[in-house]
Swiss-Prot record:
Gene: fliC
Gene Ontology CC entries for this record: bacterial-type flagellum; extracellular region
Stretches of the chain forming a coiled coil according to its record: 5-33, 97-117, 252-298
InterPro entries: Flagellin, Flagellin_C, Flagellin_C_sub2, Flagellin_N
Keywords: Bacterial flagellum, Coiled coil, Repeat, Secreted
Protein name: Flagellin
Chain segments annotated as transmembrane: none
Ranges annotated as biased composition (Low complexity): 190-199
Region (2 X 5 AA approximate repeats of V-N-N-L-N), start-end ranges: 255-266
Transmembrane as UniProt keyword: no
Amino acid sequence: MASVINTNDSALLAQNNLTKSKGILGSAIERLSSGLRINSAKDDAAGQAIANRFTANVKGLTQAARNANDGISIAQTTEGALNEINNNLQRIRELTVQSENGSNSKSDLDSIQKEVTQRLEEIDRISTQTQFNGIKVLNGDVTEMKIQVGANDNETIGIKLGKINSEKLNLKEFSVVEKEAVAAKPAVPAQPAVPADPKNGVAAKPAVPAQPEVKAQEAVKKTDNPLDTLDKALAQVDDMRSSLGAVQNRLESTVNNLNNTVNNLSAARSRIEDADYAVEVSNMSRGQILQQAGTSVLAQANQVPQTVLSLLR
């Protein structure tokens, strides 16, 4: 090797290796501080792209699981309302069986019909007012609610909904009594009593009380086969309840599957982008040793040109 002053090959080589060891140490420190093996595309371009797709899927499936839980809540809310409708129908059927007994007076039947009417109005109220997050689920506005249960397009589960009220159940004109039509009559004012007048041959007349106005009433026809009609209504409610129960079970299974998929994808992503601390601590120690050794060697390499001066003495 020639003895030169302008170019110190040994120092340049030591400096180059020192720069490399500095990069190793810096990379190890970055990974240890972030917990990630891939902090930018330069670390692993293909791995970074794969991990990014996994992240998109994990976030989408996590939200899909929340959507499915919302779907379960919708089905539970609707089924709870149908359960109350069922209770009212059961009571109406009980009253109808009671009304079929021949020992009931007209007054008894009227009392039974009043409760039947109130129960039917309650069914209509439940149908009109039952809602989830502002969406009415039993008034017919929504026939099917789609729940997004996947991270991609068209991955949905439909919840069948429908209108359930007295009209839909064929109970709009349901009656356990039969009434004839009544014509309207105007109110009649009271007439004062007329005292007797023997001189003029006028007999006394008692006071006539006022007669209230009689409003017209249409004839009410008793429902034919009322118990069969109610059984069909109950079957209609049961059919919708069973459908909601089935979709609840399906959504619960969907949530479990989504959670398993999220766990597996998260584990796969971790294997790609997360830092192995045992490896990185080893790399950091190696980088530190190389830095210390490189610095020491560079200092010695810088002394090599000094030996040329001895030739000038």
